[in-house]
């Protein structure tokens, strides 16, 4: 009871609330909006089109600005226009749907993706505050557990629509997401064996000391152990990334939507903001998946030879610069890595064709599952012989 009335309790509560608001309203929503915009521009570039390049901001309304610069902003106002469009569209609910579950499904599809971000450390420290909402010991297991709930939203959307196409999309998503969750979990085990922790900040801390798992030379040197572990880590990275594509229903794994076969799959009957929630959930899951890959394999917020937000590590002469500046650098580095991975998601979507359903299951169960399982024993053997 004394803790509840102490200043430490209110400090932790206040900083956690501030980090949550920052993460949702200043990171997730803008990143989702401009990831959609980036996808439309990149797809246009790949297909030799122009893409959205007209919608801007009326800069002439700003006091002191006489010229309208909106045509030169390259369509950067398009996400705002899209948001307004979704808000103003009629929220039509077909008469044949099961209304309770029809309304519940978009929330179940979106919320897990946002909640998983709570365990992601997106920086070291900033002004003495850890840049993670919930620095829990079971961070990786927490992310796997919460992200698995999103399949219920997709299944409910397909079932409650009382329509053949959404139902088929929901059934596909069930088998696909459950199959690839297993592969994704097994792919993460070598990282846990090497780092010795399921706490995400501890995994990043290991990479700060020993070098990124995918690029161990970033600590300034290479040992025999690091060279030997490099092979299973690369295998784990490949299988984990492929599984993440399948978990987020992105091409070439978008069988639950599959526009050429199922119209729009599980969200065929949805419109307006309920459709936008599915959209938001998909892109938030992409951000969470990219962030998890950065944490597990790419050193999290760490940049080689750069101190963290607490003034630890890095080159000695850089410690003369205030630590809060390095805290900002760490946060920027983390989200820059996430942005690069998001571009990879977009690039792959507009490059590779969709798998057939039998090919999807064959890849997951006959290849990725066995490779991830053998890779665990390979990692354990290397750790045992190089101890």
Cite the ranges covered by each PLM segment.
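Selective transmembrane helix interface/packing segments
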Residues: 1-387
């Amino acid at each position: 009871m004394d803790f509840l009335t102490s200043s430490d309790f209110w400090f932790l509560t206040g900083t956690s609330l501030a980090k949550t608001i920052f993460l949702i309203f200043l990171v997730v929503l803008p990143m989702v909006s401009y990831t959609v915009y980036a996808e439309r521009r990149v797809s246009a570039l790949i297909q030799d089109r122009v893409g959205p390049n007209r919608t801007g901001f009326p800069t002439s309304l700003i006091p002191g600005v006489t010229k309208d610069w909106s045509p030169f902003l390259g369509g950067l106002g398009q996400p705002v226009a899209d948001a307004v469009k979704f808000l103003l569209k009629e929220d039509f609910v077909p008469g044949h749907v099961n209304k309770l579950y029809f309304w519940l499904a978009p929330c179940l599809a979106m919320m897990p993706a946002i909640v998983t971000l709570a365990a992601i450390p997106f920086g070291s420290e900033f002004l003495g505050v850890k840049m993670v909402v919930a620095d829990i010991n079971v961070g990786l297991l927490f992310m796997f557990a919460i992200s698995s709930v999103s399949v219920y939203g997709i299944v409910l959307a397909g079932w409650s629509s009382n329509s053949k196409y959404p139902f088929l999309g929901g059934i596909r998503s069930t088998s696909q997401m459950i199959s690839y969750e297993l592969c994704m979990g097994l792919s993460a085990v070598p990282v846990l064996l090497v780092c010795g922790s399921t706490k995400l900040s501890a995994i990043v801390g290991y990479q700060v000391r020993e070098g990124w798992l995918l690029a161990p030379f970033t600590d300034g040197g290479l040992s025999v152990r690091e060279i030997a572990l490099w092979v299973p880590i690369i295998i784990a990275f490949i299988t984990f990334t492929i599984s993440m594509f399948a978990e987020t229903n992105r091409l070439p794994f978008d069988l639950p939507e599959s526009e050429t076969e199922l119209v729009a799959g599980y969200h065929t009957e949805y419109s307006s903001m309920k459709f936008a929630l599915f959209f938001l959930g998909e892109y938030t899951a992409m951000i969470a998946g990219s962030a998890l890959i950065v944490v597990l394999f790419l050193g999290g917020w760490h940049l080689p030879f750069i101190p963290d937000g607490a003034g630890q590590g890095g080159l000695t002469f850089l410690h003369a610069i205030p630590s809060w500046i390095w805290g900002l650098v760490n946060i920027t580095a983390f989200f820059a890595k996430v942005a690069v991975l998001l571009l990879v998601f977009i690039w792959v979507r507009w490059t590779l064709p969709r798998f057939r359903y039998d090919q999807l299951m064959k890849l997951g169960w006959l290849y990725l599952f066995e490779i991830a399982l053998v890779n665990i024993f390979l990692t354990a053997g290397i750790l045992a012989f190089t101890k």
